[in-house]
């Protein structure tokens, strides 16, 4: 596959060495929130490579391994001789202890998962301004049994004696909890202390700076070549359209492929918004029948995603011959897309991520190997909230910037089982009601996603003294900061009642509404 362009040219102030944690990219995001640039790299990165990058700090991420087991991932031990501050998080702390002469064993009592009060023993350096009793997020089955020479305890919990440690004279620190997770109430204080007080970083990573660097890199790589953008109308592709328009102007052609799986009224809104209001040329391609015919009889969700991804690119290739030629395909791929499609486990022999898939994403999992385009993906290192900030800075209005995330395969993966015209029409009407009532209640901007799901089973009901057999609709509303983790939104009963009453009365083919109250993990936000 052709090379990818992403906005990453500068040296990072903080390097995160990834040992397979699901939160490695989240650490990078938290650091960027402090306006300091960070980069995630493989744990196999050598000390010499790190020295050449000249970072001001190194973070060793968590991971699923145990340092005392054969095949556990280890970093280059020379990293501890670079004279650079190091913060070990969870597995990273255990690794540092193990490498520097301490010992790690399975937790003597029980594994510690979830929230735990942190009792601060030494409120200095890393734990400055961290209030004793603050809630921190734990996720570990091993514990430090013996500290290396010179290390001191900074904090403990009821189950973990060495919850935070330090070797002050070398600026080595470790925390058994995850400060990057939103559940850690003073986690950002810990991160800021490390980034600013210990590593002496300067705040030089801002939204406008990202835009300037992304524009410059796109211009450098694309040159005078033409770029074709897959425009969906969501915040990701819309932000990308504005960014590329700023970078290369008339070299950009936006193409909206209506695959028939959009929400109600979206194709019309998209065309009028970009073409009429912002004068950005958008080529409209009606491929509804092509897509749905390819899904006939298909019930496996992974197959649906692959087929939609394949057809999506094929249409692009065909239309590019008519409109082009084009050299580059632009995609609004984000960090969570890449993480969930590649898995997070690490092969200790190669240092590569093992593809333990959660599910393939439309942007990255459905691409055919014979793809004829080079890829332009300047947003692939950003989280959703960062993309919204970029879009806002580029001039996108709130009606686009604040739109809820919508999957590339659209309603096709919110209909469990086979996709039909009848089911699509039913789901569109139900989904519109969910979003209308959420908006009417003033909750739209307080919720990460709110949508409907159609189940491929029949539920018995009674309407007008008649027995009915119709589809149930699932209402899915979640709160999140980045899509990596999510919790179900506690909607007022009055809002839920309106949604339910309207759906069963206004949507043909539905006689039951249920509420999904599953968090992520263990579930995912989407049902397929």
From Swiss-Prot:
Transmembrane segments: none
UniProt-recorded Gene Ontology molecular function terms: ATP binding; GMP synthase activity
Active site residues according to the UniProt entry: 90, 178, 180
Pathway it works in: Purine metabolism; GMP biosynthesis; GMP from XMP (L-Gln route): step 1/1
Key words, A-Z: ATP-binding, Glutamine amidotransferase, GMP biosynthesis, Ligase, Nucleotide-binding, Purine biosynthesis
Known EC number: 6.3.5.2
GO CC annotation: cytosol
Reaction equations catalysed: XMP + L-glutamine + ATP + H2O = GMP + L-glutamate + AMP + diphosphate + 2 H(+)
Alphabetical list of InterPro entries matching this protein: Class_I_gatase-like (IPR029062), GATASE (IPR017926), GMP_synth_C (IPR001674), GMP_synth_GATase (IPR004739), GMP_synthase (IPR022955), GMPS_ATP_PPase_dom (IPR025777), NAD/GMP_synthase (IPR022310), Rossmann-like_a/b/a_fold (IPR014729)
Gene3D superfamilies: 3.30.300.10, 3.40.50.880, HUPs
GMPS ATP-PPase domain span: 205-403
Domain Glutamine amidotransferase type-1: 13-204
Binding site for ATP: 232-238
Subunit structure comment from the entry: Homodimer.
Function per UniProt: Catalyzes the synthesis of GMP from XMP.
The protein's name in its UniProt record: GMP synthase [glutamine-hydrolyzing]
């Amino acid at each position: 596959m052709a090379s990818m362009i992403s906005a990453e040219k500068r040296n990072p102030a903080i390097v995160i060495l990834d040992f397979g944690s699901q939160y490695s990219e989240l650490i990078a995001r938290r650091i960027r929130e402090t306006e300091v640039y960070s980069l995630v790299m493989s744990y196999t990165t050598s000390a010499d490579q790190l020295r050449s990058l000249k970072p001001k700090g190194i973070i060793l991420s968590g991971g699923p391994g145990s340092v005392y087991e054969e095949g556990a991932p280890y970093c280059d031990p020379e990293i501890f001789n670079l004279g650079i501050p190091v913060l070990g998080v969870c597995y990273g702390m255990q690794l540092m202890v193990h490498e520097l002469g301490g010992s790690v064993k399975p937790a003597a009592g029980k594994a510690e998962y979830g929230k735990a009060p942190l009792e601060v023993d030494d409120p200095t350096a890393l734990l400055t301004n961290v209030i004793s009793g603050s809630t921190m997020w734990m996720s570990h089955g091993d514990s430090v049994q013996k500290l290396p020479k010179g290390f001191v305890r900074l904090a403990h919990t009821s189950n973990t004696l060495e919850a935070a440690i330090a070797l002050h004279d070398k600026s080595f620190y470790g925390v058994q909890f995850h400060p990057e997770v939103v559940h850690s109430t003073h986690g950002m204080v810990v991160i800021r202390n490390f980034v600013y007080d210990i590593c002496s970083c300067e705040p030089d990573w801002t939204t406008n700076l990202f835009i300037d660097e992304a524009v410059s890199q796109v211009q450098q790589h694309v040159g005078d070549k033409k770029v074709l953008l897959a425009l969906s109308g969501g915040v990701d592709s819309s932000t990308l359209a504005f960014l590329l328009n700023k970078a290369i102007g008339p070299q950009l052609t936006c193409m909206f492929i209506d695959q028939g799986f959009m929400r109600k009224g979206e194709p019309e809104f998209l065309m009028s918004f970009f073409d009429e209001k912002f004068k950005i040329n958008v080529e409209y391609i009606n491929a509804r029948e092509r897509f749905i015919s390819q899904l006939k009889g298909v019930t496996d969700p992974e197959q649906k995603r692959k087929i939609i991804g394949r057809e999506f690119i094929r249409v692009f290739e065909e239309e590019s011959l008519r409109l082009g030629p084009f050299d580059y395909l632009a995609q609004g791929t984000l960090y969570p897309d890449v993480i969930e499609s590649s898995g997070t486990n690490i092969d200790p022999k190669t240092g590569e991520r093992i593809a333990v898939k959660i599910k393939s994403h439309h942007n990255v999992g459905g691409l055919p190997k014979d793809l004829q385009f080079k890829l332009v993906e300047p947003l692939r290192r950003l989280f959703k909230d960062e993309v919204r900030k970029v879009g806002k800075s580029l001039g996108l209005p709130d009606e686009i910037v604040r739109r809820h995330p919508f999957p590339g395969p659209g309603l096709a993966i919110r209909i469990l089982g086979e996709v039909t015209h009848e089911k699509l029409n039913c789901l569109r009407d139900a989904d519109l009601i969910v979003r209308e009532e959420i908006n009417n209640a003033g909750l739209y901007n307080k919720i990460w996603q709110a949508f409907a799901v159609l189940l491929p089973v029949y539920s018995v009901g009674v309407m007008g003294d008649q027995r009915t057999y119709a589809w149930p609709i699932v209402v899915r509303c979640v709160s999140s900061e980045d899509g990596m983790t999510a919790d179900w939104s506690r909607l007022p009963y009055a809002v839920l009642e309106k949604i339910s009453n309207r759906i069963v009365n206004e949507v043909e083919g539905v006689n039951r509404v249920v509420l999904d109250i599953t968090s992520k993990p263990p579930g995912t936000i989407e049902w397929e």
